[in-house]
Amino acid sequence: MKFLFDLLPIVLFFVAFKVAEGQPDAAAAFASQHFGFLVSGGMVGPKEAPVLLATLVVIVATFAQIGWLLLRGRKVDTMLWVSLGLVTVLGGATVWFHNETFIKWKPSVLYWVMGTAFWLSHAVFRKNLLQTLMGGQLQLPPAVWRNLNFMWIAFFAFMGLANLYVAYSFPTDVWVNFKLFGGVGLMLLFTLAQGLYLSRHIKTEDE
């Protein structure tokens, strides 16, 4: 359930982009009429309308996520606050400057922030962030926790680079597809690989 909740802004970004992409002239007119005050020059063109509207949707969705959690008295994860800050700043820049480059950098920056957090927890604070997040759900040797930590660091670094590669090498619609399907697919594959690694080790420990 949490996975779907976390995925919601990405899904809404995808849907908003595809709807606007299917009727760019109407999307441009709608964006100019209702959100022109947020855009430099006050006018939105058909080519840029899909990504600008999708960006506004994802900003609102992220604010709504945090608002929902706060209203229910639940803790807001640190990375969700970071994501809100990034999507507001970079998304706002995309809308104001008519430049999709800013929002395209957002996933990479978020991945690298998470990877840096994992690295700093190990290198500076001598703690294993993954072990802390797991909350004692698994009992593993320090070496295994260390390997898992570095696996996540490498994965976040790779995902940040992969996002930029797609963003700069392919049209925006391909990047939007990758953002949802590629990002989620790679995350699931990595999680599966990590699960296989853990299951093998846990079996060894049980024996």
Swiss-Prot record:
Keywords (A to Z) from UniProt: Cell inner membrane, Cell membrane, Membrane, Transmembrane, Transmembrane helix
Signal sequence interval, chain numbering: none
GO cellular component: plasma membrane
Main location: membrane
Subcellular localization, as worded in the UniProt entry: Cell inner membrane
Membrane topology, from the record: Multi-pass membrane protein
Record keyword Cell inner membrane present: yes
InterPro entries in alphabetical order: YciB
Regions crossing the membrane: 3-23, 51-71, 78-98, 105-125, 150-170, 178-198
A Pfam match: IspA
HAMAP family: YciB (MF_00189)
Role summary: Plays a role in cell envelope biogenesis, maintenance of cell envelope integrity and membrane homeostasis.
Similarity comment text for this entry: Belongs to the YciB family.
Protein name (Swiss-Prot/TrEMBL): Inner membrane-spanning protein YciB
